[in-house]
A protein has these predicted regions:
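Flexible helix-coil transition and linker loops at the boundaries of alpha-helical arrays
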Residues: 56-62, 93-108
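Terminal, low-structured helical/coil segments at or just beyond the last alpha-helical repeat
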Residues: 127-162
Length: 162
């Protein structure tokens, strides 16, 4: 069973946000990876080649939702956005059948996955879908700083695009 640490989650979210700006479109968005799971160390180290290699040998079907989320983050950083949408969606589906977390921690974790999904959608041009996902993230955890920042960015883009 994986143990979820909110303080580690927040720290990792900030680390990923400040360390990975692979493209102009991605530079301002914030991503969250889960610690103590596949791909985490390579993500934190900023080694995208190692991250990709780590996930190459793993099947999305066999991953739990922590791992599927980290795969989603890796795919966003590697600019494989459609694959990231699939991985984040899978993480959300897997979370529905998981009993690894308490209800409170599950909401915090799900909010992070929805926020990551929203980033992938926004970058592919689906800002309306991204906005809906971020509203869901914030309804699950209104204190999610990454979701708040991402929501503000997407809302600004929606207004500018009107």
């Amino acid at each position: 069973m994986k143990h979820f640490s909110h303080s580690k989650l927040a720290l990792i979210a900030l680390t990923l946000a400040s360390s990975f700006a692979t493209s102009g479109a991605l530079a301002d968005y914030r991503l969250t990876a889960f610690s103590d799971t596949v791909g985490f160390k390579a993500l934190v180290d900023g080694d995208l080649a190692a991250t990709k290699s780590t996930f190459t040998s793993h099947s999305l079907k066999r991953m739990d939702y922590f791992e599927a989320n980290n795969l989603c983050v890796a795919q966003i950083l590697l600019e494989e956005f459609e694959s990231a949408i699939t991985s984040c969606t899978s993480a959300l589906e897997k979370a529905e059948t998981s009993s690894e977390l308490t209800i409170k921690n599950e909401k915090v974790a799900l909010a992070s996955v929805y926020s990551n999904l929203a980033v992938a959608k926004a970058i592919t041009g689906d800002t309306v879908g991204a906005s809906v996902d971020l509203e869901m993230a914030l309804s699950l955890n209104q204190k999610d700083g990454n979701a708040s920042i991402n929501y503000d960015l997407i809302s600004t883009n929606l207004v500018a695009g009107s």
